[in-house]
């Protein structure tokens, strides 16, 4: 892995500093109460799962993902989209809870891949094993149709050797602290995606590995704000940055800048979104009545809320609730949908 051509430009240095500053602030803040953090993590997890599977062509909305997650115990998923979401959700939970116990080795990568595709019927033959057929990367339109080859990946023959070299580079570079941990993660991911070691699921696995690398490097706020949704919102730029760097990886001096800048800006967006959410939570809780806090708790847990829901939950009068809802809408903490009897409220 040729990293000598990485240029630490003033903008890149500024991004690294801003992200690290937030990492330090998060650790010292004590941030929010555990139940508030759990609510944030739940929302971020739903966004991450929805976005990461949609980037690959799934059509499930965040709302459908949320409904599916509430039925995970059933272990019966009819569509391919549902199978992919279920696998992604389980691996995300594993990473969040056990990131200190998952060394990034060939065995663990294959285990994560096997778990990721656990419910995917069409992937039964190859899950948990490196590819045996070529799998050049295509770009997909919103209908899920392939609209062209983005780049050619490693051959099945070269894949085991290339992965062994990449994993050795990762282990050595982390142990010797030769590079900033965010740059290590970026270099690993772009190489992993250029090799594309598994027959399918590489994109999803790369985003799970990004989270794992960040958590292991001490960026413990990552589960509370979705990086995947930032990437989904700039999908064209994501593919372009990947392609611009990946096509140079075998050159004497690879061009790392497009990918490094894309990923660092995405990480900047991720932490800024979280800072806004935390500030909004703090402000909300310091200024709100007990009833308003209960309404916000309910909508975070259920995705939506009606006056009838809160009459049932709190016993408050409809008139008091209507006034409280109006206040929350005014403060831009909730948004009103529908009208009349079918009015409901959701988070912005």
Predicted feature locations:
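FIC/Doc superfamily catalytic core
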Residues: 1-348
């Amino acid at each position: 892995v040729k990293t000598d051509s990485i240029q630490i430009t003033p903008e890149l240095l500024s991004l690294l500093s801003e992200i690290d500053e937030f990492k330090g602030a998060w650790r010292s803040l004590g941030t929010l109460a555990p139940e508030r953090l759990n609510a944030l993590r739940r929302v971020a997890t739903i966004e991450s799962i929805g976005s990461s599977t949609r980037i690959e062509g799934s059509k499930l909305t965040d709302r459908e993902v949320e409904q599916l997650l509430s039925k995970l115990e059933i272990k019966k998923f009819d569509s391919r989209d549902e199978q992919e979401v279920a696998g992604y959700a389980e691996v995300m939970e594993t990473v969040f809870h056990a990131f200190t116990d998952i060394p990034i080795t060939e065995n663990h990568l294959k285990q994560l891949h096997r778990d990721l595709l656990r419910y995917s019927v069409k992937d039964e033959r190859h899950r948990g094993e490196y590819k045996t057929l070529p799998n050049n990367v295509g770009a997909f339109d919103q209908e899920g149709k392939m609209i062209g080859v983005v780049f050619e990946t490693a051959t099945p023959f070269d894949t085991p050797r290339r992965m062994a070299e990449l994993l050795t580079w990762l282990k050595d570079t982390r142990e010797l602290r030769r590079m900033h941990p965010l740059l290590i993660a970026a270099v690993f991911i772009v190489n992993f995606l250029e090799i594309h070691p598994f027959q399918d699921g590489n994109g999803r696995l790369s985003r799970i590995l990004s989270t794992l690398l960040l958590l292991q490097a001490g960026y413990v706020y990552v589960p509370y704000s979705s990086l995947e949704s930032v990437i989904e919102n700039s999908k064209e730029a994501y593919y372009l940055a990947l392609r611009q760097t990946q096509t140079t990886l075998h050159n004497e001096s690879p061009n790392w800048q497009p990918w490094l800048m894309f990923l660092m800006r995405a990480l900047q967006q991720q932490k800024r979104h979280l800072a806004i959410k935390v500030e909004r939570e703090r402000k909300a809780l310091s200024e709100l009545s007990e009833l308003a806090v209960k309404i916000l708790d309910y909508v975070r847990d259920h995705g939506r809320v009606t006056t009838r829901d809160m009459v049932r939950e709190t016993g408050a009068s409809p008139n008091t609730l209507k006034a409280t809802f109006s206040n929350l809408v005014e403060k831009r903490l909730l948004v009103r949908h529908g009208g009349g009897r079918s009015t409901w409220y959701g988070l912005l």
